[in-house]
Every structure is written in C-alpha cells, then in structure tokens.
Amino acid sequence: MSLQVRILTPEQVFLNVSADEIILPTNTGQMGVLTNHTPLITAIDIGPMLVRSESTWQSMALLGGLALVKDNQVIILVNEAELGSDINAEEAETTFLAAKEALANSKTRKDQIENNLAFKRARVRYQVATLVK
C-alpha cells in the first residue's frame, strides 16, 4: 500500500502521485509521513518537500499552506510549489545571495519583513535545485 499525494495550488493540481514516503516542511520542523500515518492537519512552512517512490526521490519547493493526512491520502494546499528539477541552480544561487544581502542591509522593520520572506523563498528554491539530482 502507498500514499496518494496531491499538491494543489490556486492555479492547478501541481502533483498527483503515489509515494512510499514524503517529508514535509511544517511550522515545527520537517515531518516524515509513511503509509498508515495517524490522521492530522498541519501548517506547511516555506521549505523543501521530498517525495520517495520506490527508490527515487523527488524534491520540490513549497511556499506555505496546509496539509491533511488521512487514510493513506495526503492533500497539500499551498500558495506556490515548484519542482527542484525545474529550477536553474545557478540562477537560484544568484537570487539567494542577493536576497541574503538585501536582508542583511534592511533599514526599516517593513523592509526586514519583506526581505526575510524573499530570503526564505530564495533559500528553499536554491536548496531543492541542489538537493536531489
């Protein structure tokens, strides 16, 4: 038996696959989900998600949302999602370094909040672009 994993964004069904294991970025840290997991609802943070089907891992960036786990089904509603294989690693690194510098040079509280969000988004894109090849 496997997990049925669906990732939904406002624009589309981003992913609909069977998986043996997933690792979710929750607000309290990374959480692994295997078959027959106890039912739960959890907040999804900006972070990398990993999906294992047989012996193959697939990485993706999730940009905040909710996940529901019940009866070997995982439904994830997120603002945005992007496959690691679709991200240009060099471009992601450049964006990450620029976001890191912008965060360090934030002058106002508003700039700090906006730059922190941009930094988290850039960091996760860079992580998943280089995580699993």
Curated annotation (Swiss-Prot):
Keywords: ATP synthesis, CF(1), Chloroplast, Hydrogen ion transport, Ion transport, Membrane, Plastid, Thylakoid, Transport
Keyword Transport: yes
Membrane topology per record: Peripheral membrane protein
Pfam family of the protein (one): ATP-synt_DE_N
GO MF terms, alphabetically ordered: ATP binding; proton-transporting ATP synthase activity, rotational mechanism
Entry-linked InterPro entries: ATP_synth_F1_dsu/esu, ATP_synth_F1_dsu/esu_N, ATP_synth_F1_esu_C, ATPsynth_dsu/esu_N
Keyword rRNA processing carried by entry: no
Cellular component terms (Gene Ontology): chloroplast thylakoid membrane; proton-transporting ATP synthase complex
Domain of life: Eukaryota
Subcellular location: Plastid, Chloroplast thylakoid membrane
Subcellular location, principal: plastid
Complexes and interactors: F-type ATPases have 2 components, CF(1) - the catalytic core - and CF(0) - the membrane proton channel. CF(1) has five subunits: alpha(3), beta(3), gamma(1), delta(1), epsilon(1). CF(0) has three main subunits: a, b and c.
NCBIfam families: ATP_synt_epsi
PANTHER family: ATP SYNTHASE DELTA/EPSILON CHAIN, ATP SYNTHASE EPSILON CHAIN, CHLOROPLASTIC
Function: Produces ATP from ADP in the presence of a proton gradient across the membrane.
Family: Belongs to the ATPase epsilon chain family.
Protein name: ATP synthase epsilon chain, chloroplastic
Organism for this UniProt entry: Nephroselmis olivacea (Green alga)
Gene behind the chain: atpE
